[in-house]
Design a protein with these regions (language model features):
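Positively charged n-region of N-terminal signal peptides that target proteins for export
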Residues: 1-5
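Sec-dependent N-terminal signal peptides
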Residues: 6-12
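Residue-level signal for mature regions of secreted extracellular proteins and peptides
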Residues: 12-13, 199
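C-terminal motif of bacterial Sec signal peptides marking the signal peptidase cleavage site
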Residues: 15-18
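Non-cytosolic coordination micro-motifs
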Residues: 23-65, 102-239
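Compositionally biased P/S/T/G-rich terminal and signal peptide-adjacent segments
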Residues: 42, 48, 52-95
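Short, solvent-exposed coil/turn segments at beta-strand boundaries
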Residues: 87-100, 124, 220
Length: 239
């Protein structure tokens, strides 16, 4: 892994302290009122916000994180914070800016999360049984894929979009694997097939109870599309 990508992964770890034509139950996972792959300024424009209306935690050529604390209504309920996270996947350093890869929404403790869940079901279909996400950093000395699986429960609903395995042409799988290793710590030729089977272009989570999802103390929604952005970047690099 080159030093630039290692730096990006480290920054993302700190910032996190976080298909077209698919069936009804697998609708494309899109962020509210904006789109994946958009820059900070494009997301702000979509949300009709100026820079002085948001908290900018970090903004570099590699990554960015901004928060909106204006009690915006998202999925039918008022929020207490909306966090947007951005990453630059261009390895050459010649082009590219950080683009939207994750949205994490915190709701007040008294928010009606049943309403939030129903609104998400309208957009994304029925909850899946489970989803798997992969972190962009590893514990010191750990060479395994940093893999986390979240299962549907009374206080947790999960959604996923198109699987990576379905998106990658079978005759190009080896080429994608070689390129993808630079973007995913712990990825090897040996675990590539399993990774593609479990990885979705984008995922979403709706948590409605204490410790239902590690990122939130209680109520929250997390949407993440890092794999989908890497897929588009790798595909573009192959042209």
């Amino acid at each position: 892994m080159n030093k630039k990508l290692a730096g990006i992964f480290a920054m993302c770890a700190l910032l996190l302290t976080g298909c077209q034509g698919a069936k009804e139950s697998s609708k494309e996972i899109t962020p509210p009122d904006t789109g994946w792959g958009k820059t900070v300024d494009e997301v702000l424009a979509d949300w009709n916000l100026d820079r002085d209306q948001v908290e900018i935690f970090s903004e570099t050529e590699s990554a960015a994180a901004i928060a909106v604390d204006t009690e915006a209504t998202v999925f039918g309920e008022q929020t207490s914070r909306v966090m947007f996270q951005f990453i630059n996947l261009d390895q050459t350093g010649a082009t590219g800016k950080p683009v939207l890869c994750e949205v994490d929404i915190t709701y007040p403790d008294d928010a009606d999360m049943d309403t939030v869940k129903k609104e998400m079901e309208k957009s994304y279909g029925s909850s899946k049984d489970s989803i798997t996400r992969y972190e962009l950093y590893q514990s010191l000395g750990d060479d395994q894929l940093p893999e986390y699986t979240y299962k549907k429960a009374d206080q947790l609903a999960v959604w996923s979009g198109e699987s990576l395995k379905d998106a990658i042409p079978s005759d190009k799988s080896t080429e994608y694997e070689t390129a993808w290793e630079a973007y995913q710590p712990g990825l090897t030729a040996d675990n590539w097939e399993s990774y593609t089977e479990q990885t979705s272009m984008a995922t979403a989570v709706c948590a409605s109870g204490a410790e239902a999802f590690p990122m939130f103390e209680k109520n929250g929604v997390s949407l993440e599309a890092y794999p989908g952005l890497v897929y588009e970047q790798v595909k573009s690099n192959m042209k």
